[in-house]
Amino acid sequence: MPKGEGKVVSQNKKANHDYFIEETYEAGLVLQGTEIKSIRAGKVNLKDSFAKIERGEVFLHNMHVSPYEQGNRYNHDPLRTRKLLLHRKQISKLIGATKEEGYSLVPLKLYLKNGFAKVLIGIGKGKKKYDKREDLKKKDAKREIERAFRDRQKQF
């Protein structure tokens, strides 16, 4: 399966709005038992999450996984830091990329692949306000063109 395929559980739509994504990597997650059950139920939010490299390992911060309803006292902390599983070469590439000014690691989507939870992280460079406006203008123009084309097709 190519990168990003599988049952998508959660997407970080804000990431494509706030960053220019240059490269993506698929990473596994180190989870507890009740966390994977909540993820399979789709109770996860990637909106404010980010990845950080600490002591040569990659960690995912602020990913909210809701507590499992039947988890009682064995439930997990919803915002705990989770370790990402990547190859050493990939981690060294990420270290090199994030040392550059303005680059950061952003989780793009969380999905299930062959029963395992995977996260697609991207190396992103932050957009300026005028870049965001430009993207919105392009999107609106594209929508208008499609609408005009669709209306023209209806006439024939």
Curated annotation (Swiss-Prot):
It comes from the Bacteria. SUPFAM superfamilies: Small protein B (SmpB). GO terms for cellular component: cytosol. GO terms for biological process: trans-translation. Its main location: cytoplasm. CDD domains: SmpB (cd09294). It is found in: Cytoplasm. GO terms for molecular function: RNA binding. Keywords: Cytoplasm, RNA-binding. The keyword Cytoplasm applies. PROSITE patterns: SSRP. Pfam families: SmpB. PANTHER family: SSRA-BINDING PROTEIN, TMRNA-BINDING COMPONENT OF TRANS-TRANSLATION TAGGING COMPLEX. Required for rescue of stalled ribosomes mediated by trans-translation. Binds to transfer-messenger RNA (tmRNA), required for stable association of tmRNA with ribosomes. tmRNA and SmpB together mimic tRNA shape, replacing the anticodon stem-loop with SmpB. tmRNA is encoded by the ssrA gene; the 2 termini fold to resemble tRNA(Ala) and it encodes a 'tag peptide', a short internal open reading frame. During trans-translation Ala-aminoacylated tmRNA acts like a tRNA, entering the A-site of stalled ribosomes, displacing the stalled mRNA. NCBIfam families: PRK05422.1 (NF003843), smpB (TIGR00086). Belongs to the SmpB family. This is SsrA-binding protein. The lineage of its organism: Bacteria, Bacillati, Bacillota, Bacilli, Bacillales. The gene is smpB.
